[in-house]
Structures are given as C-alpha cells and as structure tokens.
Amino acid sequence: MTTLLNPYFGEFGGMYVPQILMPALRQLEEAFVSAQKDPEFQAQFNDLLKNYAGRPTALTKCQNITAGTNTTLYLKREDLLHGGAHKTNQVLGQALLAKRMGKTEIIAETGAGQHGVASALASALLGLKCRIYMGAKDVERQSPNVFRMRLMGAEVIPVHSGSATLKDACNEALRDWSGSYETAHYMLGTAAGPHPYPTIVCEFQRMIGEETKAQILEREGRLPDAVIACVGGGSNAIGMFADFINETNVGLIGVEPGGHGIETGEHGAPLKHGRVGIYFGMKAPMMQTEDGQIEESYSISAGLDFPSVGPQHAYLNSTGRADYVSITDDEALEAFKTLCLHEGIIPALESSHALAHALKMMRETPEKEQLLVVNLSGRGDKDIFTVHDILKARGEI
C-alpha cells in the first residue's frame, strides 16, 4: 500500500497486518497528516496538554543522591502529569484524531495500567466509549489502576490466553479492532506496532524532549551529557530522545528490563538479546525461540514486560546513535528505594530502571563531571503493593 509517510526506519517498521486493517491504517495516517497541518487541531491539543494535563512538567534537580560525586542529575517529571505518567500526552492526541475521524469508541491495551488509565480519562473527557484489554496477570498486580479505569467508565477485559500479559492484551485488542474499525479507533499505547503508530506516538510525545532541552539550557546553560529513559515498547524514551537526536554531543541511553538477569532468559531486552522478526504489525527485534515463536518476556515492571520494541529504537540502536543497556529487577528496586528515601519521590518501577542506570554511571565514575537527565516517566503509586510484598518477603519491613 502506498503511504503518505515513510513507514520504515532503516529496515525496521512497516505494516504487517491483515488486509482488512489496511483501510483503517490509511484513514489514520491521512487524519494525522491533515491534523499536523491544522492550526485548530494543534491549538486544541496544546490547550489540553497545558490546561488539562498540566504541561510543561517540572525538571527537578536531585539534591541528595549525588552528594560526594561530580554528577549533576535532573529528573524530567512526567510523574506529575495528570494520570500519573507520560501516557497522557499521546492519548489526548490520539483521542482528538479519533473524534476527527468520526469514531465513537476507543480500544486500547495496557500492561502496567497507565496507558489504560490515560485512555479512560481521555475517553471520558471527549465523550468516547472505551474498552481496555489487559493481561490477567497484570489485572492482579495493578489493581489500583484497574479500579481507576472503571471509575472513569472504561470496560476492562482480562486476557487469559498465552502468558496473560501485555503481548496477549495487544493481540486481543488487534483482534477486536479487526471487526470494529469502522466505529472504533485502536489507541495503541507505545511507539511500536504497524505504521503509522510509531510516528504518531513519537510526535505526540516529543514535547518531553523539547521541554527538557529548554529547561536544562535555562538551568545549566548547556545541554546534558546524556538523557536516559526506560524502554519497553519505547514511547517515553522516543519522546525524550526525539529532540536530541541531532544534538550529537548528547548521549541517548535506553534502559531495557534485565529481569532476573540476562543469563537466566527471564528478561525483556530484545534490542540487545533478541533477533529481528515480524510481530505486532512491524519488523523489529524481538525475543524468539529457535523456531521463531515469540518468547515470554519478564520484568518486575508490568509496563516493560513486552517481547519487542519500537522501530525507531531498533534503528537508533543499529546506527549507534543511541546506546541500550539493561537493568535487573533488583537494581531497579534499589533505585526505587533510593529515590524514595533521599529525594521524597516515589517513582514507577519502569522509571526506576532508567534511574538505576544513572546511579550506576554516577557510582562508577564519581570523579567525572557529568550532567544527566532521567525521564521519570511515571509515579510509583501503582507499584507500592508489589514493592511492599517483595520487601516483606525479604524481611526488610
């Protein structure tokens, strides 16, 4: 199918979906391209970001955890956004696109529940029906967010097939959309999936990096040495990276979930430890068995528990413009505790992976003068029960 925008990033991306969905994807691409040129759409989107979501978000300097080192560490506070995470940014944009296309329903998938909450709040605000697919395991471990979604009128549908996690929720959401696309918009939650979703999500998240650049120049008078973000599908990271890609002196560091350790096979790090294949409508690195079946990913963080990654990240990795590392559950948990104890901020377990890598950089070279920015992509209220149970089992509380 001929597209208006390039569906690939290098060799990654594309539109590997059933023929029945091609008209829906084409309609979405046309609506997006039109909206990007429409001052009225942009004004409405920017008004919602400012007066409903609460942008711009703060850039907070860590006062205590860098003591005794030459590291200056800032946090981009997406946790302060309405809804509790960066997810709110792009769902407002997609919900406006849905209205522009005349859709009356929203279909979404969610892992940690943050995208589900964001989809529910945007649907409630704009008068759209909303149904959300969520792995049954994630429904159990993210019960506060499930209740929030239902409070805002969303129907939450537990998915019991497969590993009962995010990848299975994605499959069910796509299956639903195949039969309902004439009235429903599929509000994909990350910078992955078939074209044009990776491009749309990147554009509707790029204000994270744009704000960060302006704020750090105002605060420090220079650009950071590196910006750091966690990577599951990759939306918060591409939102942070997008405005810095051409700033070649700024390192881009994406942090994948190392789970119980890469050597155990129980992780979610396809960029560094997967193989390229076709999944979820795109060509990208993914966790596969020897015979090409999609492997189960694992992370303490439901929002990073995804066996593939967005095509922009695959491309940035292949060109060497961005570096991708992994952080284990234990390292993320220590970073979570550190930020709580020393800065009075409770981060999401997803964001704790990015923070853990920044702290590792700080500890390994304490004498090095470095200016780092971590994208604190969400708040940790949703994770307190998970952390409580782990710490209780360890006898730490």
Swiss-Prot record:
- What HAMAP family does the entry give? Trp_synth_beta
Query: EC number(s) in its UniProt entry?
Result: 4.2.1.20
Give the keywords, sorted: Amino-acid biosynthesis, Aromatic amino acid biosynthesis, Lyase, Pyridoxal phosphate, Tryptophan biosynthesis
Which reaction(s) are listed as its catalytic activity?
(1S,2R)-1-C-(indol-3-yl)glycerol 3-phosphate + L-serine = D-glyceraldehyde 3-phosphate + L-tryptophan + H2O
- Which Pfam families does the annotation name? PALP (PF00291)
Instruction: Give the modified residues of type N6-(pyridoxal phosphate)lysine.
Output: K87
Primary gene name: trpB
Q: What is this protein called?
A: Tryptophan synthase beta chain
